[in-house]
Amino acid sequence: MQKQTLSFQAEVAQLLKLVTHSLYSNPDIFLRELISNASDACDKLRFEALNDAGLYENDSELKVRVSFDKAAKTLTITDNGIGMSQQEAIEHLGTIAKSGTRDFVAKLSGDQKNDAQLIGQFGVGFYSGFIVADKITVESRRAGLPAAQGVRWVSEGTGEFDVSETLRAERGTSIILHLKDDAADYLNAWKLKGIINKYSDHISLPILMPKEEWKEGENDQPGEMAFTGEWETVNQAAALWTRPKKDITPEHYAEFYKQISYDSEAPLATTHNRVEGATEYTQLLFIPAKAPMDMYNRDKAAGVKLYVKRVFIMDDAQALLPTYLRFVKGVVDSSDLPLNVSRELLQESRAVKAIREGCTKRVLSMIEDLANNEPEKFKTFYAEFGAVLKEGLGEDFANRERLAKLLRFASSTTDTTTVSFADYKARMKDGQDAIYYITADTLAAAKSSPQLEIFRKKGIEVLLMADRVDEWALNYLNEFDGTPLQSVAKGAVDLGKLQDEDEKKAAEEAQTQFKPILDKLKEALKDKASDVRATSRLVDSPACLVVQDGDMSTQLARMLKQAGQTVPEVKPILEVNAQHPLVRKLEASSELASFDDLANILFDQALLAEGGMPTDPAAYVRRVNALLV
């Protein structure tokens, strides 16, 4: 057959430009794409040979070979798979998104699909070679055709390609990339092995490269690496997650985890599971023993690697786990996951959602197992990842109850252990109808908060929350197992049956008796406080700040301001202890000129007690100094 010059189909030239300049953000992946295609071709041969063993042509050891020629500036990827006929080369290489494997799978039916280990969803992988090459030569012969019916396909990635017949003894396909000048670094065995190890290590076929050894120089010439004439396998050629779990030791899992996570420690927990059904996939997931430095960066890349049929697709498959589980490392290998044209982003689909739900449930089960059966490991886990786990209350409604059961908090009744909501409920006092908690900037601030005084007096436990995320997260959790959650720093204190009638009566009388001074305090503090009232929640402190139920706490407002966010102004309520000597002194000084200064000192001290800072520290110092003189 004479050489034919044919045109790519309409828009192909434009698409080639897109592929080579815009489609892939990382040029190294061209090798991933071409090795993936080679693996597909071998899988297709294996399937067709089930009915015609002669297609193997006495060569049933399927493999992929990668080699380069520095002098010619070429990189060659060769497989001994199914190969192509002349017509197939024209159809499959002349049309973007014309995938031979896609057409092949379409012809299958029933159980045959389960036996065809094909990727077949990526129509542009071959053209990624033009990222690094200004010319691509393809030589191929389809299994079963005579050597004289080989085909050569050549293109420079413009609007045309040449096709001619060639003599080719071996079955399969060779793709020769004529590298651009700025791609010469791919003529390096070390670099190529690194790319293969990263992207194609778990391809089930062996990937071979020419073996190199150090050769000493002669006649004072420097030594160099030289080819030995042998081939060596440069990938593992076996995906760990595809092996039976009974054949995998904890050491195997640990080494694999270290390889994919670049962590030096073994994982805290591991789950390996094959999911079958409408969506089929394998999950091998790990919980690290230590949190990474960027754990609180919600935009960080996720830790789950996505594979399709053991072919690496991406490092940060964020669609496969919710953001609050971003600490999880591992692999998801899907049999039928749909991907977009460049493989760089997952499409939203039922399959993706099913995998996300399955992986989330599996990780939560891992954490629950630690909590129930390995308390020391769970303690380690919670110290590292408890804060980000709380984010799930606002992100994952479906699993909110499971997450709530996993949360742990410090307590006003113990300094040595953390407690769960279930622990708290089990020791609630008779007549107590709420789970009480307080949020603060630090655990020390929470422990010393004036709002706890009445609860300590009555022996009522209060959960102490000092993570930055606590206030935000608890907006999404109003109750636990039927018992409401109540902040001791919001609304008026109401201990219900736990507060005796004498206390209630005394509080009401104080509000009435103390009304004139309360009104004067309101006027003096009208720019700072929305209200001033007497309270029964204080025992030793003169005053404290609270907000209305439903309002943003002062602690959350401070946190959001520090993060640079716009925060609506919420004036707190100043509650005063009518029995405290300082308040009594204030009452006696109500007609003095210094009253406003004393009122502001009282407010600012209450603000300081909860970890805040006076809006005008200099004015506060000046007022205190004047009081001391």
Curated annotation (Swiss-Prot):
One of its GO terms (cellular component) is cytoplasm. SMART domains: HATPase_c. Gene3D superfamilies: 3.30.230.80, 3.40.50.11260, Heat shock protein 90, C-terminal domain, Histidine kinase-like ATPase, C-terminal domain. Pfam families: HATPase_c_3 (PF13589), HSP90 (PF00183). One of its GO terms (molecular function) is ATP binding. Signal peptide: none annotated. SUPFAM superfamilies: ATPase domain of HSP90 chaperone/DNA topoisomerase II/histidine kinase, HSP90 C-terminal domain, Ribosomal protein S5 domain 2-like. Residues 559-629 are annotated as: C. Residues 344-558 are annotated as: B. The keyword Acyltransferase does not apply. Keywords: ATP-binding, Chaperone, Cytoplasm, Nucleotide-binding, Stress response. Residues 1-343 are annotated as: A. It is found in: Cytoplasm. It comes from the Bacteria. The keyword ATP-binding applies. PANTHER family: HEAT SHOCK PROTEIN 90 FAMILY MEMBER. Belongs to the heat shock protein 90 family. Homodimer. Molecular chaperone. Has ATPase activity. This is Chaperone protein HtpG. It comes from Polaromonas naphthalenivorans (strain CJ2). The lineage of its organism: Bacteria, Pseudomonadati, Pseudomonadota, Betaproteobacteria, Burkholderiales.
